[in-house]
């Protein structure tokens, strides 16, 4: 007997889970196909930051804020650990402080709850901050912290208990209009098919990626043992200002980039910007570097890890910590400046990928858009 669904989702990372979630919320019969026993890619290898502060004001900021709402709903419904810990951007140079002042004073901060703190006020808000050399801090209360190593499993379990058909340890080897073929030869039939295959650009619709400027990105990360302090808030420094689109229109950003290129070129050569997230158990997730291209080495470089730890150690007290884990993640990213790759290679099949390292922040809202639009299209077709 044919297996018939309203929606078939390929890939159980955060993008795939979000499509299944949106389909379920719309009353659809959903099947979710995942080739691994559980999510093992970028969804579990990241900071766990829900990061509206880094998204450009406008469409992406609104998406991030909607995703934030969805994560809080998942915290209530699925038991996902999502904490409203906020973020702190640390300025240790006058040009970095100028960027933060420009950001708060302009429309670039629209939709956020931001404030500027003196070194004294910042040290009271974050007991681990190093005050020596600190110029000022921008604090935002908008960002969430989730536990990436458990979030996907909890969402998947809740989806399954709510009626979504979970097909684990089986891969989709072919997708056509209305049908997905699995490795065991089974055929699933569905009105809408969403392909969210993460870093796998070769199996399903490789032409869709070849037509776009898509690259894989390898990033090195670590976790540190819990320090003596507990702050919760995500920490970012001056390097991060040049990484996220939210700060692009701040006039002083050029000075920040030029100074790092001149004085510390190693960071730019390896795409390093440094952030830290504190887990519920107090341990720190830190990173990261960015190496683009198909030939990224499978071996991690300790000089990159050392540079990340040393830079973070200038912002917060790491004297009582040590490295407990090292890993690298890989994600797909569009290199033409666009936020997401979305296309329909054949009628009824949507490929969604390349959210550029912001899958946790943008994925839930983008998936909601995709599902809503596909349902609207189907309704229009019925009335044509």
Where are each of the predicted segments found?
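C-terminal catalytic lobe of FAD-dependent flavoproteins
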Residues: 271-273, 279-285, 291-384
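Flavin-dependent oxidoreductases
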Residues: 175, 186-277, 294, 298
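Glycine-rich FAD pyrophosphate-binding loop
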Residues: 25-44
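Short beta-strand to alpha-helix junction loop
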Residues: 62-63, 90-99, 137-157, 299-304, ...
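N-terminal Rossmann-fold NAD(P) dinucleotide-binding loop
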Residues: 16-17
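Helical element adjacent to the flavin cofactor pocket in flavoenzyme catalytic cores
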Residues: 137-178, 188-192
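Beta1/beta-strand and adjacent pyrophosphate-binding region of the FAD-binding site
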Residues: 2-13, 31
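Dinucleotide-binding Rossmann-like beta1-alpha1 core, especially the glycine-rich loop
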Residues: 47-125
